């Protein structure tokens, strides 16, 4: 598999990689005859984001009939797209080549300079993320910048926020439990329906509590895009879609706190090497936080899964033509 990304789209591709590394520790690469998809799952497998690039996004593409599936560590993926702010002005094109054991990323700069990054693949794990949003009757649509500005009012150490959608406005406020409500500062931000592109709320107002970190990362992908958030009852996943770039589809799905301790409606089913976690029937704060990806495993579990005997190789060459 070989894909050539034109200069104006390199920045978007790099932003997608950076966004996925904020969601999870691994980037899944899946290619077929129609799209190249990059996916990431949170450590607790309770949130998910996918960028699907259609063939029109690339200037050229060389495909294989059997498709491609691979997995990269997030840390190694960042090496090739570290300075995305200047990529559209300095890079003429980016070539991504996928082979059986590695991914080769070539950045061809102006004046003939080429940088190459060999990113080794790690063991692939088949994951299936299931969710359905076709029956949702509540949604809010607006500019990603507006919603990002709303989330910017919350401190980085706030783990969860609650979204309340009513027929006339969207409220976002800090989620607190138990005795914390007596001693903690609570932030609330309201957006009137007139400030949004679209607001649909059939029936009563709905409140959903989600992880702030993942939602902030998804909305921060590109402030110029339009985002639509679909909501349902507590325990049903929040589904977000970003639109505005031809040939690119971005989807974010996050689990929400279940009412009455019911299991979360969205789940990931790994293959037999990593059994699916069982949701205990408890409403403890730690249990809820684990389901939303808010509790962190030991530090060594967050390090890259790059094999110790393999390294990411980078090379720069001056291919300037006479």
Report the location of each language-model feature.
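Helix-loop-beta junctions that constitute the ligand-sensing/allosteric loops
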Residues: 158-160
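DNA polymerase sliding clamps and clamp-related checkpoint/processivity subunits
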Residues: 1-21, 27-146, 152-153, 164-322
